[in-house]
Amino acid sequence: MLLLAVLYAAGWSGQMQAAAPTSKADVTADAKPLPPIAELLHDVERNQKAAETQRKDYTYHVHLDEQEFDGKGQVKKTVRTDSESMNLRGVRINRVVARDGKPLTPEQAAKENERIDKEIARDTERREKNQSKGESTDSRGDVLISASRILELGTFSNPRRVTLNGRPTIVADYAGDPNAKTRNSAEGVIRDLVGTVWIDEQDHTLARAQGHFLNDFKIGGGLVADVKKGSSFEAQFIRVNNEVWLPGTVDGQGKVRILLVSGFSGHVHLVASDYRKFRTSATIVSGDAIVAPDGTPLPTAGATTPPPHP
């Protein structure tokens, strides 16, 4: 649950950008001046929108570890979930296929299908409602904050060039402006955020992001989640097939209260793997896993094996 709140707050998490073709003319990382951060952010925003079709074509496996801490900061409970992330009826969903290393029973799978159907219906309605108001949204209907608004809500500083995974990358630090006026709770999250972004210089896409929150913030007015200040996150993205950037790993740590009832204090670690592309509109192939025409995941015997912790 903490992961959902962290990803929502990160804004860019879960968004995947189109990758530019590899250039044959390699330029030394320090041989040219850094582009203006504002210009770079607008390019990232444009690339995200242009990559929408490619994002829909991909599915991947998601392994999630949730470690809950006791009052002394020691791990008291660990929950492991394996899912298949896919675009189903226009909505990006994570269909659970196993919990704690055990595949779902037929009864559990039926309940999961019901949950997915309700989630798709809810997200589709929210997307149509927000888009009818002229808002730009993701596939789940959440309103996207534009690059222009992010620049109004905070400041980017200390731009520099580094090499990340062998690729020239531009890094900049971000600090929200506590005096900035916000229009909704999502903007409040961005305003209260302090962190760092890594932008791939060739593709102009987000490659990594990390940050922490200076104040408490609420999702859905606190009805969905109430995240406490000091909560932090880090997300990394992977270039797949030289055409698209997909989620790689996400880590989050902090305190959150869910649905005004259950509290959670701990750490979450997510690893995405087994990236596959639709060959036809019916079946996802490539790699070892297959998804049936109705979207039901058919994991291989090793699909529920937790990936190694980085």
Where do the language-model regions lie?
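Sec-dependent N-terminal signal peptides
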Residues: 1-17
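Structured extracytoplasmic
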Residues: 19-194, 201-208, 212-231, 236-249, ...
